[in-house]
């Protein structure tokens, strides 16, 4: 690749680093083209799986202001740029690596933090935003039904207390 071509690739990669909500670095040695295509399909529209030279990735990451990825950029590397839910992408990578041992997740970068391979696995174990919202909605629904029961129970208790006092006064009289 000639210098102008490399500069164009670096500019494109830099833009991808800047726009991504997260970045995962993988080693793809041993994956076939159909397996890589399958991975790209599973990752979905909000991600891109990019193969380039490590030097170009390093330069682009540095220009995008991302430090700490150099140690992970050794050997054949591909970068997953995530525009959407980066936890969901981590889960897809984890699951794909379970069935395709050739894929190795080296680490990543999300929310201003660099993660090693173990950190990327921990991200995959987190619940996704929709799952957390569903849990919150369920908790709120339960709390609201308890509150409704409580609000209905208070007037009933007051009425029973008044009836008991009236009965007591009638017996005393």
Curated annotation (Swiss-Prot):
A GO-annotated cellular component: large ribosomal subunit
Taxonomy, superkingdom: Bacteria
Keywords: Ribonucleoprotein, Ribosomal protein, RNA-binding, rRNA-binding
One Pfam family here: Ribosomal_L10
InterPro entries: Ribosomal_uL10, Ribosomal_uL10-like_sf, Ribosomal_uL10_bac, Ribosomal_uL10_bac_type, Ribosomal_uL10_CS_bac
Keyword match rRNA-binding: yes
Gene Ontology MF terms: large ribosomal subunit rRNA binding; structural constituent of ribosome
GO biological process, one term: translation
Matches recorded under Gene3D superfamilies: 3.30.70.1730, 6.10.250.290
Function, as annotated: Forms part of the ribosomal stalk, playing a central role in the interaction of the ribosome with GTP-bound translation factors.
NCBIfam families referenced in this protein's UniProt entry, alphabetically: PRK00099.1-1 (NF000955)
Homology family: Belongs to the universal ribosomal protein uL10 family.
Subunit structure: Part of the ribosomal stalk of the 50S ribosomal subunit. The N-terminus interacts with L11 and the large rRNA to form the base of the stalk. The C-terminus forms an elongated spine to which L12 dimers bind in a sequential fashion forming a multimeric L10(L12)X complex.
Protein name: Large ribosomal subunit protein uL10
Gene: rplJ
